[in-house]
């Protein structure tokens, strides 16, 4: 089961134009978002370390997201 709250995930799908959404669809998107978020986070940590920092900054996240 995904750790992200399901209600906001459902709103994301609704904002994309869906009228009805199954619980399985919400769970699947939540899982995909978590996996993508972890991948971006790992890359952002690498970028911060490469810059000689222990703190991950917003720019690290933005750069990591663009690279993936």
Swiss-Prot record:
The keyword DNA-binding applies. It comes from the Archaea. Keywords: Chromosome, Cytoplasm, DNA-binding. It is found in: Cytoplasm; Chromosome. The keyword DNA-binding applies. Residues 20-22, 54-57 are annotated as: Interaction with DNA. The record marks 14 as: Interaction with DNA. GO terms for molecular function: DNA binding; protein heterodimerization activity. Signal peptide: none annotated. Its main location: cytoplasm. Binds and compacts DNA (95 to 150 base pairs) to form nucleosome-like structures that contain positive DNA supercoils. This is DNA-binding protein HMt-1.1. The gene is hmtA1.
């Amino acid at each position: 089961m995904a750790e992200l709250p399901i209600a906001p995930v459902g709103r994301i799908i609704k904002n994309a134009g869906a009228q009805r959404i199954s619980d399985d669809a919400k769970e699947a998107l939540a899982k995909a978002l978590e996996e993508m978020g972890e991948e971006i986070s790992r890359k952002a940590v690498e970028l911060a370390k490469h810059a000689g920092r222990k703190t991950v900054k917003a720019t690290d996240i933005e750069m990591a997201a663009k690279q993936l």
